[in-house]
From Swiss-Prot:
The active site is at D128. It comes from Dinoroseobacter shibae (strain DSM 16493 / NCIMB 14021 / DFL 12). This is Cyclic pyranopterin monophosphate synthase. InterPro entries: MoaC, MoaC_bact/euk, MoaC_sf, MoCo_biosynth_MoaA/MoaC, Mopterin_CF_biosynth-C_dom. Substrate binds at L75, C76, H77, M113, E114.
Length: 158
């Protein structure tokens, strides 16, 4: 476990000490999708979901999710997030909704988990809001697409 920073020499989990790390600007972009029946997508696009505006609520839920990441994932540091933006794009070819979250901070550790949490919570919210008509929806392809800043530098998924 020598390469895993969240474990000590005995293998016990611990929160990484970032106090000696330099404060730098950091950004992370995560992506994912919710696949659904074409009829479900049409209902969302037409604003006919009984629970309300699915995409607007999912966007807000994603923002809230990013802000609550340290409360949800035990070893994540609470961070001063400076930006959370979500794009939710209906895609008839999927069919479903594509989700992208961008999170920024200026701090001692990155915001990858916050971006991934934002996408995940937005996807879960879409599922929750229309599950009554489509229980077969799939939350899929949730992944880190890009990160920059900090000691490890830049990462771009292929």
């Amino acid at each position: 476990m020598s390469g895993l920073t969240h474990f000590d020499a005995q293998g016990a989990a611990h929160m990484v000490d970032v106090s000696d790390k330099e404060v730098t600007d950091r950004v992370a972009i995560a992506r994912g999708a919710v696949r659904m029946a074409p009829e479900t997508l049409a209902m969302i696009e037409g604003g006919r979901a009984k629970k309300g505006d699915v995409l607007a609520v999912a966007r807000l839920a994603g923002i809230m999710g990013a802000k609550k990441t340290a409360d949800l994932i035990p070893l994540c540091h609470p961070l001063p997030i400076t930006k959370v933006a979500l794009e939710l794009v209906p895609d008839a070819d999927l069919p479903g909704v594509r989700i992208e979250a961008t999170v920024k901070t200026s701090g001692q550790t990155g915001v990858e988990m916050e971006a991934l949490t934002a996408v995940s919570v937005a996807a879960l919210t879409i599922y929750d809001m229309v599950k009554a008509v489509d229980k077969a929806m799939q939350l899929t392809d949730i992944r880190l697409a890009f990160k920059d800043g900090g000691k490890s530098g830049r990462f771009e998924a292929e």
